[in-house]
Amino acid sequence: MKHKKRFKHNLSHVNKLSADLGELIPINYYEALPMDSIRQSVSALVRLAPLAAPIMHKIDVRIHTFFVPNRLLWKETDASFEDFITGGSDGLDATTHPYKDLSAISTNRGDLLDYLGVPPGAQPDDYNILYARAYNLIVNEYYQDIDLQTELVISTDSGADTTTATTLQKCTWDKDYFTTARPWEQKGSAVSPPLGS
């Protein structure tokens, strides 16, 4: 059997933005289908705005890449993502794709939704909320301090999503003696060693 030829697409682009220190900003996102392979490289030119006093600290710019499957973002109890795509065994599956109604929300420049493709000032009726769910899942798993911060709420239901946060998050500082200091000695209850009777 002869293999089908795979097509190649050049998706290169320029992303110009300004950001505050510590913000977790999505700079790109792709929807990947089964058997898709994506090869990417990133180059960055970083400039600082004029400051009243120079920064006396090391500044690291980190660009991380993640793959988040839809099955982690959309867990349906009575149906599956496959049923949504195929229509189920009878072809009549009516599962609604997760969305957020943005008609009552105003998007501003520099918001998470701005970085995820919703232009500032635009108010589309429905927005594919899976991108914001993926962002929040990545923040929960990789960037939050589990001792000091509460997890972001992520809905995994179909239809209208009213609980998934759509605000830009900040990352935690690198681990050192100061940032890992806690007001308690250990997690959980204290150990009481059995002493002789």
PLM feature segments, named:
Residues 1-197:
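Intrinsically disordered, low-complexity segments
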